[in-house]
Amino acid sequence: MLPEPYRLHHRADFSRTVRRGQRIGRRDLVVHAFVHTYDELAHATERHGDPVAAGSFVRVGGPRFGLIVSKAVGSAVVRHRVARRLRHMCATLVDEVPADADVVIRALPGAATADSAELARQVRSGLRKLGVTPGGGRSPAPRAHSGARPRTDARS
């Protein structure tokens, strides 16, 4: 079970993570991740009418996870089974994901027939590729080629 402080609840949090975060698709799910900074959180809080005194904003808890399991996945029973599996996987990832990250996992129709081990592998792979968990990360943009050939000295 995923404890309450580690869950995304508000529509704005889901929207921010999906729209402003990075996304990577896997066979049975799509992983969205958004890592916050202090300034972004303080600005968002001020916009909603909650003034924040300088230095008073502290995010309590750790990473937050949200799930999107639509009717395309299957019947209510199937959707809830997929959500329970994903929630359990998120609970095991709490210590690996940075505390200032929000992660949204959107289940695709194939998630209904995938087993738990396969879903876990896809979630971990997606987070690793996004650079949220150790051992991966997106490669930086390719550098522009200077046009110069590498020097090969045949002379000795």
Swiss-Prot record:
It comes from Nocardia farcinica (strain IFM 10152). HAMAP family: RNase_P (MF_00227). One of its GO terms (molecular function) is tRNA binding. The lineage of its organism: Bacteria, Bacillati, Actinomycetota, Actinomycetes, Mycobacteriales. RNaseP catalyzes the removal of the 5'-leader sequence from pre-tRNA to produce the mature 5'-terminus. It can also cleave other RNA substrates such as 4.5S RNA. The protein component plays an auxiliary but essential role in vivo by binding to the 5'-leader sequence and broadening the substrate specificity of the ribozyme. Its EC number is 3.1.26.5. Residues 126-156 are annotated as: Disordered. InterPro entries: Ribosomal_Su5_D2-typ_SF, Ribsml_uS5_D2-typ_fold_subgr, RNase_P, RNase_P_CS. This is Ribonuclease P protein component. Keywords: Endonuclease, Hydrolase, Nuclease, RNA-binding, tRNA processing. GO terms for cellular component: ribonuclease P complex. It comes from the Bacteria. It catalyses: Endonucleolytic cleavage of RNA, removing 5'-extranucleotides from tRNA precursor. One of its GO terms (biological process) is tRNA 5'-leader removal. It holds the Pfam family Ribonuclease_P. Consists of a catalytic RNA component (M1 or rnpB) and a protein subunit. The keyword Hydrolase applies. Belongs to the RnpA family.
